[in-house]
Amino acid sequence: MEEPVLRRTWAEIDLDALAHNYQQARRRIGPHVKYLGVVKADAYGHGAIQIARKLEQLGADYLAVSSLDEAKELRHGGIQAPILILGHTPPAMVPQLIEYRITQAVSALAKAEAYSAAAVESGGTLKVHIKVDTGMSRLGFLVREGHFDTGVESIAAACALPGLEAEGIFTHFAVSDEDDGDSEAYTRAQFDVFTRVLDALAARGRTFAIRHCANSGALARYPEMYLDMVRPGIALYGVGADAQRLDLRPVMSLKSSVSTIKTFDPGTDVSYGRTFRTQGRTRIGVLPIGYADGFFRGLSNRMSVVTAQGPAPQRGRICMDMSMIDLTGLPDVKVGDEVEIFGCRQRVDDLAAILNTIPYELTCAVSKRVPRVYIEGGKIVGRSLRLL
């Protein structure tokens, strides 16, 4: 493979791994269930346009983003697949939603009425998916205990508004990725509420072409919840709690290279705050990656990077642009050698566990100044560097 971006710091995006993860889900859901790939937040840091292009090539039926700007970016990048905006869009932007052929999630009757008025005024029709709050307590028509009948009536009223085409209806699970009994019961209760909503709407003559609720956790655990479409996010990128269960491969590998090596005497303090002191003669390597690149400062002195010769403990505080590693036991590592922060040899999940967070916080945090290098068939097929 040719040298990626002058071998400073980069994120390798393995499109073959992406294809593998997509096919794993396809085999699981069968030929009659649609596949929506979630590419919001720049495809969880992987590069939305490039990931969306690959998903479109693979046959994804739908894509999902968080905002109109994200949706427009995909359209400007040549993406033709249907796109669902999961988050809020101001009603004033409805003409753009229609122009760009974007489907909008609708989470309340008042919003539906505002979207309807804007669509009618523009002379077009806005395709929408109804969002139902069955237990996430975030966006969505409220249909839980004490609100079921009024919630269903509000959904029916929203679907009947002029200028709107209610193509789909969906909900979002709060703990479908957890294996304990309480979480399973909660997920099943959410699904039960959702199916009751569907039945109540069907009794009123309102049905939908696309019913969806299965996120990555439900994809791995609850095949009865696949309905018309699944909606994997983190599973698409091969990380998270279900990567092993679904036989997924990590798509992103964050890499850097050794820029400098120095040997220090015992008692030498390393980096800000003097949080590491050498105990013997110590060979320290400097990496051109820091917390401004997405290498979390909270990992300081708590993990190792991976070299071709083995793991190298990180030493001292991680700086904004640089970090230090201990090469004392790795005499063959030299300036210019590649190191892996996370990826195939060190899972991002393990670093997330150190930080008591989720792995996609780490992939999303890989900053825009880190070039994405796209690999397919062992060759570089694209690069992306976004500083603006």
Model-derived features: positions:
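A charged N-terminal "starter" segment
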Residues: M1-T103, A117, T125, E165, ...
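Active-site loop/helix belt of alpha/beta enzymes
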Residues: V5-R7, A41-L58, E113-K127, T134-S257, ...
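C-terminal helical cap(s) of enzyme catalytic domains, especially alpha/beta-barrels
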Residues: L15, K72-G77, D242-V251, P359
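Conserved, mostly hydrophobic/aromatic
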Residues: L18, K40, L74, A108, ...
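Flexible, glycine/charged-enriched surface loops at secondary-structure junctions
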Residues: H32, R206-I210, D349-A353
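Short, acidic/turn-prone active-site loops that include or flank metal/cofactor-
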Residues: D69, G87-A92, A108-A112, V132-T134, ...
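A structural signal for short, hydrophobic beta-strand segments that form beta-sheets
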Residues: I85, V258, Q314-R315
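C-terminal accessory subdomain/extension
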Residues: T263-L388
